């Protein structure tokens, strides 16, 4: 599956600069991350509704749409599939592949992407009071 998502990611990158009049992907990039997030949320809700209704075939179709929209949002945010796979490996090493990390952090966070600002824990931030 990772190969399929990697190919999809590359196709999304290739399509982002196409004509928005003919490319759904280019149109999403033109409209921005807010529209991308809305489409992702819509697809997630459709997957949930179809799953609750027991419609297996619709869950499969809507899941493909969900993964497409997630991949578009990743590309917009500068997140590569391998970044996500690295985080999944880290979590698997901590808790096993089938577990979600608790909200309190366990272990080191994933290494930040080279172009991002470093994450500074809240407790390490100095608070300045203006007089």
From Swiss-Prot:
Top-rank EC class of the record's enzyme: hydrolase
E.C. number(s) listed in UniProt: 3.6.1.31
Gene Ontology molecular function: any one: phosphoribosyl-ATP diphosphatase activity
Keywords: Amino-acid biosynthesis, ATP-binding, Cytoplasm, Histidine biosynthesis, Hydrolase, Nucleotide-binding
SUPFAM superfamilies: all-alpha NTP pyrophosphatases (SSF101386)
Record carries keyword Hydrolase: yes
Main location: cytoplasm
Pathway it works in: Amino-acid biosynthesis; L-histidine biosynthesis; L-histidine from 5-phospho-alpha-D-ribose 1-diphosphate: step 2/9
Signal sequence extent: none
Record region (Disordered): 105-131
Subcellular location: Cytoplasm
Entry-linked CDD domains: NTP-PPase_HisIE_like
Family matches, as InterPro entries: HisE (IPR008179), PRib-ATP_PPHydrolase-like (IPR021130)
Gene3D superfamilies: MazG-like
Pfam families (alphabetical): PRA-PH
GO biological process per UniProt: L-histidine biosynthetic process
Listed GO CC annotations: cytoplasm
Catalyzed reaction equations: 1-(5-phospho-beta-D-ribosyl)-ATP + H2O = 1-(5-phospho-beta-D-ribosyl)-5'-AMP + diphosphate + H(+)
HAMAP family the UniProt entry points to: HisE
Similarity comment: family membership: Belongs to the PRA-PH family.
Protein name as catalogued: Phosphoribosyl-ATP pyrophosphatase 2
